[in-house]
Swiss-Prot record:
Keywords from the UniProt entry: Autocatalytic cleavage, Decarboxylase, Lyase, Polyamine biosynthesis, Pyruvate, S-adenosyl-L-methionine, Schiff base, Spermidine biosynthesis, Zymogen
EC number: 4.1.1.50
Co-factor requirement: pyruvate
Assembly mode: Heterotetramer of two alpha and two beta chains arranged as a dimer of alpha/beta heterodimers.
Entry annotation: catalytic residues: 63, 68, 83
Organism per entry: Methanococcus maripaludis (strain DSM 14266 / JCM 13030 / NBRC 101832 / S2 / LL)
Name the UniProt record assigns to this protein: S-adenosylmethionine decarboxylase proenzyme
Gene name of this polypeptide: speH
């Protein structure tokens, strides 16, 4: 069996609220995470909400990394979806944790596009 992509979902709790509200810092974290997993960056776009919170996405040749933050709750939700054998989405986690400093990180690992003998598995 083969998979077309790997998707990790991160639940980050107890993060530093200042980091969660730092738009330039989040942009830098996304770029560093892309480098860490070996992906190819196309662009990064972030948006700062009022009074707080940041949403961002790094668009990759191999898919995307996204983040949504709630500084008032110390929480961030992230998706790292990659295609291709050379990209390792789990290698983004140390870069993300270094910047956000969560007390707890939950990781869900999903295999996307499972193919069995050259055909899509139903």
């Amino acid at each position: 069996m083969k998979q077309l992509g790997k998707h990790i979902i991160l639940e980050l709790w107890g993060c530093e609220s200042q980091a969660l509200d730092d738009q330039p810092g989040i942009e830098k974290m996304l770029v560093n995470a892309v480098k860490a997993c070996g992906a190819t960056l196309i662009c990064v776009k972030t948006h700062k909400f009022s009074p707080q919170g940041v949403t961002g996405v790094a668009v990759l040749s191999e898919s995307h990394i996204s983040i949504h933050t709630w500084p008032e709750l110390g929480y961030a939700a992230m998706d790292v979806f990659t295609c291709g054998e050379h990209v390792k989405p789990e290698d983004t986690i140390p870069e993300i944790e270094k910047f956000l400093k969560p007390e707890k990180t939950e990781v869900m690992d999903i295999k996307r596009g499972i193919i069995d003998d050259g055909e899509v598995k139903e």
